[in-house]
Amino acid sequence: MSTLLERTKSVQELKKRAAGKTSANPAEVAKAKKVLRRLYSWDEIPEWQRDNDFILHGYVKETSSFIETFKSLFYLHNESVNIYSHLIPALGFFTVLLLDKSTIKVFATTTWLDHMVIDLFYSGAFACLILSSSFHCLKSHSLRIATLGNKLDYLGICILIVTSMVSILYYGYFEKFSLFCLFALITVSFGIACSIVSLKDKFRKREWRPYRAGLFVCFGLSSIIPIFSGLYCYSFSEIWTQIQLFWVLLGGVLYIIGAVLYGMRFPEKICPGKFDIWGHSHQLFHFLVVIAALCHLRGLLNSYELVHIKMENGIVS
């Protein structure tokens, strides 16, 4: 009890000293202010931390300490929502990955390969979200750690795209395995290429930006190839059902909306400072990414169930 009272008095004394209400030497006052202050404004943070000039306050200044950076998980700042909006879903995907035998509907025809394909998507979603959350948590550490985190954040995006496409294509082209292998190879190749340009410093330089952007655009557009091929091999209604195009397209639209909001810095651009903690574009992007991933999951599970219903009825073998 005495320890608690001593701590309370110490905190109160620090507050008084920081406010200048008690006599103390300048060094003690500066130390008290440093202890009490956690958040800074745009003008007070280092140049390398400045990314969105429409977010004016709520920054965690460079800590150069993993312990201090970790402590930022337990108080509110302008990255808190970005951290938890992906950390919580990441833990959710990790949980269903561990419990996949009880979360995936089992048919008489279900095999270990089905679990592997669906777990592939769970793993990709977990990797993307946990890397994103870690980046937003650790970016206040230092320029070196922030740069590394940003690279891994992009790597997570590549992993999610690859695992999403490969998993849904497996069931979409279940009856044409050779085509699935071809499209999977194209997807993985683009994924590796985009991962390399995301991780290598050489390709992150300004002069490489157009090529890097073009590669990611081609990566995204490569998903159109299986759709048009499907229209050649199947009827529109069949490909709509087998690849679950409604859910796939809905997820894609949500990704695009999120990217547009992020690129336009909306809504903070129209009212700088108002969305510093809650509701700025990067947060909206995060939520839309999670919803899009859930849409894809719904489509994947529907496609899986459709294939096995057909197998049980003897329509496919």
Swiss-Prot record:
Induction context: Regulated by OAF1 and PIP2. Highly expressed in presence of glucose. Expressed at lower level in presence of glycerol or glycerol and oleate. Highly expressed in the presence of saturated fatty-acids such as myristate.
What Gene Ontology molecular-function terms does this entry list? signaling receptor activity
- Which Gene Ontology CC terms are recorded? fungal-type vacuole; plasma membrane
User: Has the keyword Protease been applied to this entry?
Assistant: no
Tell me, in one coarse class, where this protein mainly resides: membrane
The subcellular location is: Membrane
Looking up InterPro entries in the UniProt record yields:
AdipoR/HlyIII-related
Q: List the disulfide bonds.
A: none
Chain ranges passing through the membrane: 79-99, 111-131, 154-174, 177-197, 213-233, 243-263, 277-297
Q: Could you tell me which residue ranges are on the Cytoplasmic side of the membrane?
A: 1-78, 132-153, 198-212, 264-276
- Topological relation to the membrane, as annotated: Multi-pass membrane protein
The UniProt entry's GO biological process terms, in alphabetical order, are:
fatty acid metabolic process; intracellular zinc ion homeostasis; negative regulation of transcription by RNA polymerase II; response to toxic substance
List UniProt keywords, sorted A-Z.
Fatty acid metabolism, Lipid metabolism, Membrane, Receptor, Transmembrane, Transmembrane helix
Q: Which residues form a coiled coil?
A: none
Residues on Extracellular side: 100-110, 175-176, 234-242, 298-317
Q: Which family does it belong to?
A: Belongs to the ADIPOR family.
Q: What does this protein do?
A: Probable receptor, which is involved in metabolic pathways that regulate lipid metabolism such as fatty acid oxidation.
> Any idea what this protein is called?
ADIPOR-like receptor IZH2
Tell me the organism's taxonomic lineage. Eukaryota, Fungi, Dikarya, Ascomycota, Saccharomycotina
